[in-house]
Amino acid sequence: MLAGRPDRAPNAAPMPTTLQIAAACLFDERGRLLLVRKRNTRFFMLPGGKREPGEDALSALQRELLEELELQLQAGALQPLGQFQAPAANEADTWVQADIFHAALPHAVQPAAELEELRWLDTSLPVPDDLAPLLRDQVLPALKRLPSV
């Protein structure tokens, strides 16, 4: 079982749709975590997105970072954090299964493609209430368990 998703009871209703995504915890030189908000949405989340059919998580993440932030990161710069599941922030009756990576952000970035806003999060401060469930309930606790990122 993946972190975050309850086991299904034998006679329970069918499970909701699950999207396969890849996302990155990108840290600036001050140790702050980069968050993004897509157009016409409320919740902040990690940069990344849906995997295309047949696409591995790392390739999907590199493609999404280029599209969303015009950021090119080599595969070796992205370290795996883990695989997590949570309710999707912006799609009803949907879960996300996410491969999460972390890396240092090599330079400043600007929102592109469908991104509306960027925000920096100091992970030592209280968690804001406008974070996606995956980030709030799964990724932030996992980051706190790392020796250092």
Model-derived features: positions:
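N-terminal amphipathic/basic-hydrophobic helices that include classical n-h-c signal peptides
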Residues: 1-14
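Conserved N-terminal beta-strand and adjoining loop/helix that marks the start
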Residues: 11-33, 50
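Conserved hydrophobic "DFG−1" position in protein kinase catalytic cores
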Residues: 26-27, 35, 102-103, 120
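Conserved Nudix-box catalytic region and its N-terminal flanking loop in Nudix hydrolases
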Residues: 32-68, 72
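A short coil-to-beta-strand element that immediately follows conserved catalytic motifs
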Residues: 72-82
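Active-site-adjacent beta-strand/loop module that shapes the phosphate/pyrophosphate-binding cleft
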Residues: 84-110
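NUDIX/MutT-family hydrolases
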Residues: 100-102, 110-147
